[in-house]
């Protein structure tokens, strides 16, 4: 199994609104190999909010298929970093993607 983490640094006070955007999934569940998604808010941050999107996949290839899919492009077409100079406000200050091999998983 494989896990991808997209770690978002957000303007303070924007985490809840960002999380709510995930209530209406936009196709990730249709990608072969997708298994689970967790969207988390880091507690007790000071200057910014932090939201992590954790997705579980059968394999890294499944995740890469998602990244290269038209479904991914469509789902992310309106996502902008705050630094993008297009006149639209975005709470996203930065993001970084981390990849993990899952060595052990237990679920009750």
Curated annotation (Swiss-Prot):
Heme binds at residues 21-28, 76. One of its GO terms (molecular function) is heme oxygenase (decyclizing) activity. Its main location: cytoplasm. Fe cation binds at residue 6. Belongs to the antibiotic biosynthesis monooxygenase family. Heme-degrading monooxygenase IsdG subfamily. Allows bacterial pathogens to use the host heme as an iron source. Catalyzes the oxidative degradation of the heme macrocyclic porphyrin ring to the oxo-bilirubin chromophore staphylobilin (a mixture of the linear tetrapyrroles 5-oxo-delta-bilirubin and 15-oxo-beta-bilirubin) in the presence of a suitable electron donor such as ascorbate or NADPH--cytochrome P450 reductase, with subsequent release of free iron. PANTHER family: HEME OXYGENASE (STAPHYLOBILIN-PRODUCING) 1, SIGNAL TRANSDUCTION PROTEIN TRAP. This is Heme oxygenase (staphylobilin-producing) 2. It comes from Staphylococcus aureus (strain N315). The lineage of its organism: Bacteria, Bacillati, Bacillota, Bacilli, Bacillales. The gene is isdI.
